[in-house]
Amino acid sequence: MAHHKSALKRIKQNKRKQFRNKSIRSGLRTFIKNVREAVEAKDAAKAKEALQAAIPVIDKAATKGIIHANAASRNVSRLTKLVNTLG
C-alpha cells in the first residue's frame, strides 16, 4: 500500500478513471455491436442509423484516450465498409 499522501490520491484518481473508462468502453462496444447486428439482419436503414450513432461515440472515445486514434479510425472504416455492402 502507498505511504505518501500524493500516492494515495493517485490511487483514488486512477480508480475513478478506471470506472469511467470501463463505462465508455462498454458503451462503445455496444454501439459497434448494434451496427454489426443490423448488418447481419440485412436491415440497411437500421444499419446506417446505427452507424451514424456509433461514429461520434467512437470518435469521442479516441479523443478521451480510451482507445487509440488509429483504432477508432479503423473501427469507423470497417463499420462503414460493412454497412456499404448492404447498398
UniProtKB/Swiss-Prot annotation:
One Pfam family it belongs to: Ribosomal_S20p
NCBIfam families: S20
Family statement: Belongs to the bacterial ribosomal protein bS20 family.
Gene3D superfamilies: Ribosomal protein S20 (1.20.58.110)
Originating organism: Geobacter metallireducens (strain ATCC 53774 / DSM 7210 / GS-15)
Signal peptide (UniProt feature, chain positions): none
Protein name, entry field: Small ribosomal subunit protein bS20
Any one GO molecular-function label of the UniProt entry: small ribosomal subunit rRNA binding
GO BP terms in the entry: translation
Entry keyword annotation includes Ribosomal protein: yes
One GO cellular component term: cytosol
Keyword terms, alphabetized: Ribonucleoprotein, Ribosomal protein, RNA-binding, rRNA-binding
